[in-house]
Regions:
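Non-heme Fe(II)-dependent double-stranded beta-helix
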Residues: 1-22, 29-126
C-alpha cells in the first residue's frame, strides 16, 4: 500500500509530543466530530467571505476562481493569516474552547486544563 506524505505526522493523544518533536507538526485525527468539523469549515468560509465582501472580487466558497483572492489577505507561508482580527473569529474561539482540544493541549503540556493560555495571533489553513 502506498504511504502518503502526511501519514508520518499522524499521532494520538499519547504520542503527539514525540511526533511534534520529530517533525514539528502533528495530525490527531477524529478529535472533532462531523458536526464540529462542519461548523469549523462554515466558520472559516463565513469569515473569509465577510472580510472580502466589499472587494471587487470577494471570496466565495462556491466559486473556486474567487479563491485566488486569498493571496490579498497576505497569508504568511501561503497559509497563515495574521491580520483583520481573524484570531478572534467566533469559530476559532469555538475550537479553542472545545473540551476535546483543551484536553489534548493539557496532555501535551502536562498541566491542568485551567492552566492553559491561548494565543490570538493567526488562522492557518490548507
Amino acid at each position: 500500500m502506498n504511504e502518503y506524505e502526511f501519514e508520518k505526522y499522524i499521532a494520538n493523544i499519547h504520542d503527539v509530543k514525540i511526533i511534534l518533536d520529530t517533525y514539528g507538526v502533528a495530525i490527531i485525527p477524529n478529535i472533532l466530530n462531523e458536526e464540529e468539523t462542519n461548523e469549523m469549515n462554515d466558520g472559516i468560509w463565513n469569515t473569509l467571505e465577510y472580510l472580502t465582501s466589499d472587494w471587487e472580487k470577494p471570496i466565495n466558497r462556491n466559486n473556486t476562481e474567487s479563491w485566488r483572492e486569498m493571496k490579498y489577505l497576505y497569508p504568511k507561508h501561503s497559509m497563515l493569516i495574521q491580520n483583520w482580527g481573524i484570531g478572534h473569529a467566533q469559530y476559532i474561539w469555538n475550537i479553542r474552547q472545545n473540551p476535546k482540544i483543551v484536553e489534548i493541549f493539557a496532555n501535551l503540556w502536562k498541566c491542568n486544563n485551567e492552566d492553559l493560555l491561548v494565543s490570538f495571533d493567526a488562522c492557518s489553513f490548507h
